[in-house]
Amino acid sequence: MARHLRIAAAQLGPLHKADTRAVAVSRLRKLLRDAHSMGAKFVVFPELALTTFFPRWWMEDQTEVDARYFEKTMPSAETQPLFDEAKKLGIGFYIGYAELTPEGHRFNTAILVGPDGTIVGKYRKIHLPGHADHKPKAAFQHLEKKYFEVGDLGFRVWRYLGTITGMLICNDRRWPEAFRVLALQGAEIVALGFNTPSENLH
């Protein structure tokens, strides 16, 4: 039986180091409203959508990095308005963020949120690109391996908005095995937010 689901790919644009969570959440809420006005039922936001793409910078004070860029709970008081907006509009979304677990583990994470504003599923990025060592002479750095651990939740699917949906994040898209594992579980949609530089590392 044919099914129709209108999905919006939300282009957030740059977030700067000085931008607060409130700034990011306000922009995300507006994108939700815009997508809803066009009939979308599901919005895919980018990787690490709540902050600037901080793995570009070498920072030595991990305590400061944790406080500034990582989410200890989801939703938090700062991000709850996004979930409330989704519930108000009856629209689901995928969003990426930096997760700090109660045990002190750090992951590049994405979640599926239902149209009732509740979290349906979570995925932690497995294929981390870049490097962990400092390269001060490089044109730019890509330090995901410094700031994140390899994801530990595997490749899963969820029943979501009448479909079977899986999640990946950015660099995961370069490995066909990830899609194959999801397809073998019946995935009909793979939500995949990314945050990619205009120039690649050489």
Language-model features and meaning:
Residues 1, 87-88, 159-161:
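Extracellular/periplasmic catalytic domains that process cell-envelope and extracellular macromolecules
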Residues 1-15:
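Short beta-strand segments enriched in small/hydrophobic residues
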Residues 5, 39-41, 89-92, 163, ...:
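Loop/turn elements at helix/coil->beta-strand transitions in domains of secreted/extracellular proteins
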Residues 13-22, 60, 71, 133-137, ...:
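Acidic/histidine-rich helix-loop elements
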Residues 21-116, 122-124, 130-131, 196-202:
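Cys-nucleophile CN-hydrolase/nitrilase-fold catalytic domain and related Cys-dependent amidase chemistry
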Residues 101-189, 193-202:
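Active-site catalytic loop in hydrolytic enzyme cores
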